[in-house]
Structure formats: structure tokens, C-alpha cells
């Protein structure tokens, strides 16, 4: 139940906005606390806290997990974050890299003057988390931007379609980095016209 906005057949705006909304609530909570607003006491050891429901403790004096509070320093969680390579779920990066490497190594054979008839199927071998998150059959026909950027089928086929459409500008001497930049999926690649192309 905790993944409801991040999983399912079609993802919505809630998925795309979840980080922003939680940040907004956190900032609002800090402002209220600075103005003297007091929240419930001891939410981690409270027997009614959601944390206690999921991870029961032996008695009421223990928290189900350790929490370390700091007031200064540079060991913040944000420093452990990484950025996605583009507008797609990061589990697709290895498949995208494989496709781009294949286009780089076999430019003429794959792009064949923009003719897709030489491509009869695409087989992607991936690891379980990638399949479970973006490869399952529920993600085959996305109808929203949020579902499309979580669909391995959509991401790979869109990059390949983009390469075929722009075949005249793709040269064998392009570097892998050039191809990544050139074939990067943009917001327009997730618009209604692209979704139903």
C-alpha cells in the first residue's frame, strides 16, 4: 500500500510531484516550528505511531529504529543523492546505454536510412528490480507521461524511433556522449502526440 502512487498500470501527476510535495510540507513544518507550533511528542516511541505498527518494539521505551539528529556539519542525506541521466526511470540506464552503443557500433545497419523494417524485435535482458519497476507488462502501453518514463518498452522504442527519424544527422563517428545528448528524451517525447505515435 505504501507504493500506491509509484506503482500500477498508469502513474499520475502524484508520482511526479511526490518529492516536491513532501519538500513543501517539510519546509512548512519548519516554518511553523520556528513560529512556536508544537507537534505531538515522541512520535517514534508512541505505541500508535505508524512506525510502531510496522516495526513493533519490545516495550514503550524503545524506538523501532535509530534516529540521529544533528545541528551542524556536512553529513546530510542530500549529499548522498545522485542525478538521473535524463527524463526516464534510472533503472533503464543500462538498456539505453546498450541501445546507444549498438547504434554507435552498427549505425548504418540499424538506422538503414531511417527504415525500421530491418528491426523485427528488440530483446532486453535486465536485472529483477529493473524488470519489476519498468519492465512488467502493465507498463507496455503508457497513457500518461509518468507511466511512459517508467516503461522500458516506451523508453527504448522512443529512443530508437528518434534515432530512425534523425538518421541523416547521426554519423558513425559520433561519440557515445554525442549520441546520448542527441537522442536524449525531452518533455515533448512524453507529450500526447508522442505517447500515441
Regions found by a protein language model. Name each.
Residues 1-5:
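Conserved catalytic cysteine-centered active-site region
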Residues 7-24, 31-197:
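Terminal-appendage/accessory-domain detector
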Amino acid at each position: 500500500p505504501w507504493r500506491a502512487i509509484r506503482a500500477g498500470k498508469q502513474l499520475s501527476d502524484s508520482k511526479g510531484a511526490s518529492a516536491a510535495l513532501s519538500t513543501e510540507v517539510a519546509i512548512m513544518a519548519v516554518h511553523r516550528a520556528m513560529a512556536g507550533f508544537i507537534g505531538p511528542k515522541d512520535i517514534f516511541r508512541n505505541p500508535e505511531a505508524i512506525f510502531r505498527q510496522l516495526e513493533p518494539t519490545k516495550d514503550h521505551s524503545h524506538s523501532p529504529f535509530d534516529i540521529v539528529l544533528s545541528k551542524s556539519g556536512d553529513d546530510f542525506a542530500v549529499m548522498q543523492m545522485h542525478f538521473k541521466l535524463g527524463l526516464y526511470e534510472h533503472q533503464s540506464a543500462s538498456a539505453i546505454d546498450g541501445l546507444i552503443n549498438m547504434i554507435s557500433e552498427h549505425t548504418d545497419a540499424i538506422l538503414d536510412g531511417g527504415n525500421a523494417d530491418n528491426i523485427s524485435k528488440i530483446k532486453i535482458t535486465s536485472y529483477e528490480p529493473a524488470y519489476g519497476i519498468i519492465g512488467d507488462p502493465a507498463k507496455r502501453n503508457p497513457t500518461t507521461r509518468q507511466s511512459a518514463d517508467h516503461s522500458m518498452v516506451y523508453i527504448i522504442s522512443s529512443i530508437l524511433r528518434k534515432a530512425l527519424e534523425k538518421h541523416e544527422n547521426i554519423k558513425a563517428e559520433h561519440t557515445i556522449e554525442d549520441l546520448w545528448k542527441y537522442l536524449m528524451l525531452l518533455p515533448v517525447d512524453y507529450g500526447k502526440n508522442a505517447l500515441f505515435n
